[in-house]
A protein has these predicted regions:
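Patatin-like phospholipase
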Residues: 12-53, 61-303
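Bacterial N-terminal signal peptides
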Residues: 1-8
Length: 303
């Protein structure tokens, strides 16, 4: 009896800590997340929980499903982001600028060169949802995940944080990526959901509540364009104001983590950036993650 008791106490004392990863919002900056996951995987760091907000839910969801960062990297480097994720609605006529991508269209609006009727969103998100469906193969939270995973979205009516961990994974990701103004709010059950970055840009608390002992938070807020923003009309003023406000919220969310990965970068960030720029961001994610590995291993060994 004594030996059995000693054995169970010994096993409990040396149980490995649960490690969680919180992947933050950040649009085309998401290549950083790929670099982070590459290093964690190569270092043999097993993730027990993942949560993601906005584009972080996209990368986090694919990894929780596939647990194959090479497959994700291959997809991301060949991705035509404008085609699948930023295609304008068919009912919006772009007569003054002809055939164009959404980015150009949005730019023309911000410059005051084009008028639009008031809509719930410039894009309905169908092409994006179809692509995420294809990638995830209509997988569900309940049956298909290799790593426990949760997604953060924002309830547009109540302003509350909505944590999704049931149903089709692609629906949750699409809801979390529904940037207000760009996409029509995503109808989920009885809610109207939009981008989770409005309320929890780096979902550290969610990962902690899942059961993680050690939480790694990845913030993309310091990845910025290499040119100063042009502030010349009401749209650009509103956009910049929201950006500044969310920057502080991002810091508050990320700083709750035991380890924060917050790369600094100035360079091209458009959704149609060249492949070499994508690779540069991935490598930056790798470099910044390598810096925190000694601390992470120290924290792990302290349990």
């Amino acid at each position: 009896v004594f030996m059995l008791l000693y054995s169970s106490v010994s096993s409990f004392s040396y149980a490995a800590p649960k490690i969680g990863l919180a992947l933050g919002e950040g649009g085309s900056r998401f290549y950083i997340h790929i670099g982070v996951l590459k290093v964690l995987e190569s270092e043999g760091i097993k993730l027990d929980y993942i949560a993601g907000t906005s584009i972080g839910s996209f990368i986090g969801g694919l990894y929780a499903l596939w647990e194959d960062i090479d497959k994700i990297e291959k997809y991301a480097l060949s991705l035509d982001f404008d085609k699948y994720y930023l295609s304008p609605r068919e009912d919006i006529r772009l007569q003054s600028i002809g055939e164009t991508t959404f980015i150009t269209f949005y730019s023309e609006i911000s410059k005051g060169k084009i008028g639009i009727e008031l809509l719930k969103g410039l894009m309905d998100g169908k092409i994006m949802r179809d692509e995420i469906d294809r990638l995830t193969n209509w997988a569900s939270f309940e049956y298909d995940l290799k790593i426990p995973f949760k997604v953060v979205a924002t309830d547009l009516i109540t302003g509350e944080k909505v944590v999704i961990d049931q149903g089709r994974i692609s629906n949750a990701i699409a809801a979390s990526m529904s940037v207000p103004g760009m996409f029509i709010p995503f109808k989920f059950e009885d809610k109207m959901l939009v981008d989770g970055g409005l309320i929890d840009p780096v979902p550290v608390d969610v990962v902690r509540e899942m059961g993680a002992d050690i939480v790694i938070g990845v913030s993309l807020r310091d990845i910025q364009e290499d040119t100063l923003p042009v502030i010349n009309n009401v749209v650009s003023i509103l956009y910049r104001s929201v950006y500044i406000m969310l920057g502080e919220l991002n810091n508050i969310s990320a700083n709750k983590a035991d380890i924060v990965i917050r790369p600094h970068y100035r360079g091209p960030l458009s959704t149609d950036m060249e492949k070499e720029n994508k690779i540069q961001l991935i490598k930056l994610g790798e470099e910044e993650t390598k810096k925190i590995i000694p601390l992470l291993k120290t924290l792990i060994s302290s349990y």
